Amino acid sequence: MMDTGCVWDGYFCDFDRNFAIHHASDAAMGAHQRLFDATEAALDILKPGISANDLFSAMDRILRPNQTAQMGSEEVGRYGHGLGIQLTEPPSLTTWDKTVIKAGMALTIEPSISYGDGLTMVAEENLLILDDGVVLLSERAPRDLPIIFVP
């Protein structure tokens, strides 16, 4: 995983990209695809008027089907946050943050998943909320985990 970002004219960006070197296990490929699908679930419902916790729930249903752990346990973290003149700003995409999403907000969608033997993978996209939807500010990560340096 590469977690990176930059500052432009006082505003932050923050995004992750995942890749495998030479080959990827089935578990890693599956985890990456679930992260992509969770991000899609959030993007499908994201518009002004939805709440931060609704976005969390949409992603959590994909990442942890049939699970009941709530935010605040060690098992579940947030799945994104606001972005702007600080790297991490409100709202937090959690079960407890009921902030209503408004046009003009910049957010990260940042689902994470544990897989295999203590491994974690995170995907992160930057986006801007418009009056009628959302525009991605980062180039969308592919659904299939990129493999680099193939022998």
List where the protein language model places each region.
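Active-site neighborhoods and metal-handling regions in enzymes and metal-associated proteins
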Residues: M1-P151
